[in-house]
Amino acid sequence: MCLRIGSSTRQNGRVNKEAVELFCAILALATLAGGIITLAALALEERMTWTNAWLTQVRASGIWIICLITTGAMLGSLYFSEHVGFAPCKLCWYQRIAMYSIAIISFVAALRNDKNIVRYTIVLAPMGLVVSTYHYLLEWYPNLETNVCSLDVPCTAVWFRELGFVTLCFMAGCAFITVIAVSLAVMRGQKIDSTSIHQEN
């Protein structure tokens, strides 16, 4: 009887983990879609009518959007490492440093309504994106490994691959791309506001 209960618990745990993996994958793709739309709106600003409405919303809530994305990514990474038991490699830690830093400073900035924080997010996010992109390539092409990681926790290990291509570092990359897009939108909005003020004076 005890063996059956233990087996059932492990099975339920596995189902829950797989459900979380799928949920996080879908959430990452939705985040990426938002980032791509924002980048497209920036490229087409003043050429298409829908871009103004989209960018207005992004600029108004930009810091909270960045905070929400990075905090979600931070909590997700902690769930997989601390609860599920996925050991983070050295590249994972580099991505965490960038992601966690953005999450903390954006939360403080959001509380203070300080949009100048994008000066830092626009630096940290690309750095994280470079690492996550390289990490993602290693997952598909292990021969690109340059002895960056240890043998105990190799960077080429793939804990899961949802929908055939979504891995943990892919999710991180989606978050970094969207943070970059939102940061650019906020920065351009600040520039437009500054130009308008100078013209009025």
Describe each region flagged by the PLM.
Residues 93:
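Cys/His-coordinated zinc-binding microdomains
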Residues 2-90, 99-102, 106-201:
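Secretory/periplasmic and organellar redox-cofactor proteins
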